[in-house]
Amino acid sequence: MGKVYDWFEERLEIQAIADDITSKYVPPHVNIFYCIGGITFTCFIIQVATGFAMTFYYRPTVAEAFASVEYIMTEVNYGWLFRSMHRWSASMMVLMMILHVFRVYLTGGFKKPRELTWVTGVTLAVVTVSFGVTGYSLPWDQVGYWACKIVTGVPEAIPVVGSLLVELLRGSVSVGQATLTRFYSAHTFVLPVAAAVLMLTHFLMIRKQGISGPL
C-alpha cells in the first residue's frame, strides 16, 4: 500500500491537499449555528441519493405519474422509506436554508469581502425553493396539479411578456403533459446541476476567505 500511496502522492500531492483541508483556522466565536449550512448540504446529498433511486420507477406522464408514485410507496422494496426520506429531507433543507440565511445576515457574513459568497448563497436559496415548486407537482395528484397551475399562472400579471412567460413555463397555453415534462426535467437535471455549480463556487469562496469574524 505504501508504494501505491507514494505513486499517487508524487503525482497529486495528496498530503498537501489533506493538510490544507485540515489546517484551516477556525475562529473562537464559531458555535453550533455555524453548522446549519453544512446540515443544508447534507439534506441536499440525501435528496440526490433518494431522488436518483426513485427515478428508476417514477414515470413522468400525466397518465402514469400518480400510479408510479403509488407503486413506489406500496410495491418497491423500501420505496416508502426512500420517498419519505426525500420528502422530509426536502422540508428540512428548506428550513435549514432559511435559518442559514438568517444566521449569515445577523452575524454580518454578507459584508465585504464576502459579497459574492452572499450572492451565490441567495441564488442557492432561490434554487432550493424552485426544487420544492417543481417537485411538489411531480406526483400529479390534485394538490400537485393545482399548485402547478397556480404557480405557472403567476407571471401572467407581468405586463407585455406575462403570457409568453406562462406559455414558456407550461409548454402550452394550459397545464398538461408538456408542463409535467418541463417540471421533471428542471427537478432532476437543470436545478441539480445549477445547485452543484453554485455550491462548488460557494464552498471555494468560503475556503478562500474563511469564516467571517465576530460583529
Curated annotation (Swiss-Prot):
UniProt KW Nucleus keyword: no
Cofactor note: Binds 2 heme b groups non-covalently with two histidine residues as axial ligands.
Residues the entry annotates as binding heme c: 35
Designated gene of the protein: petB
Main location: plastid
Family: Belongs to the cytochrome b family. PetB subfamily.
GO cellular component: chloroplast thylakoid membrane
Function, as annotated: Component of the cytochrome b6-f complex, which mediates electron transfer between photosystem II (PSII) and photosystem I (PSI), cyclic electron flow around PSI, and state transitions.
The protein's assembly and partners: The 4 large subunits of the cytochrome b6-f complex are cytochrome b6, subunit IV (17 kDa polypeptide, PetD), cytochrome f and the Rieske protein, while the 4 small subunits are PetG, PetL, PetM and PetN. The complex functions as a dimer.
Protein name listed in UniProt: Cytochrome b6
Cofactor(s) essential for the protein: heme b; heme c
CDD domains listed in its UniProt record: Cytochrome_b_N (cd00284)
